[in-house]
Amino acid sequence: MRIVSYSPAYREALLDISLRAWEPVFPRMHDDVPEFVYDAFYPQGWQQRQLSDLKEVLDQEPENVSVAFEGERPVGWVCTRIHPEDQMGEIYVIAVDPKYQRRGVGQQLMEHASAQIKDAGMRMVMVETGGDSGHAPARALYESEGFVRWPVARYFKDLSK
């Protein structure tokens, strides 16, 4: 496997990988959060929201994106962001083709991203994910890579009632 800088030629493949990678996540998350919250975040469905958000990432910050290839096929990608005011880098997006999950692709993308962040002079790296059951595999990967969970509580109240 090799990891290369993003090219717009990879855009559609990365969007496809992301939707397939997160296909099992969102139904489980939907079951774990209040309906009014899910509907507020995903009024046109999770796929539409994710596509919109990911297109923006790929179009607005291509220099922050790295792509994992197996042969000539893209199998995953990662986007990093640097927050110098906090001396911190962030793994903002990570997605691995379901056919290549649990083969070390995510781990290698995490290590690649962490090295880029360290090379930028940052003192720490952060990754954020959901606490719902759909995101349990992501949390397991992050913990296996030495990330420590920061307890955060996020509350929502339905004002339509």
Describe each PLM feature range.
Residues 104:
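Conserved G/P- and acidic residue-centered "switch" motifs that form tight phosphate/ATP-binding loops
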Residues 123, 148:
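Short acidic/polar active-site loop segments enriched in Thr and Asp
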Residues 5-92, 97, 110-111, 116, ...:
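Acetyl-CoA-dependent GNAT
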Residues 107:
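Residues forming the Rossmann-fold NAD(P)(H) cofactor-binding site
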Residues 1-2:
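Extreme N-terminal starter segment of soluble prokaryotic enzymes
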Residues 142, 147:
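Conserved active-site tyrosine of GNAT-family acetyltransferases
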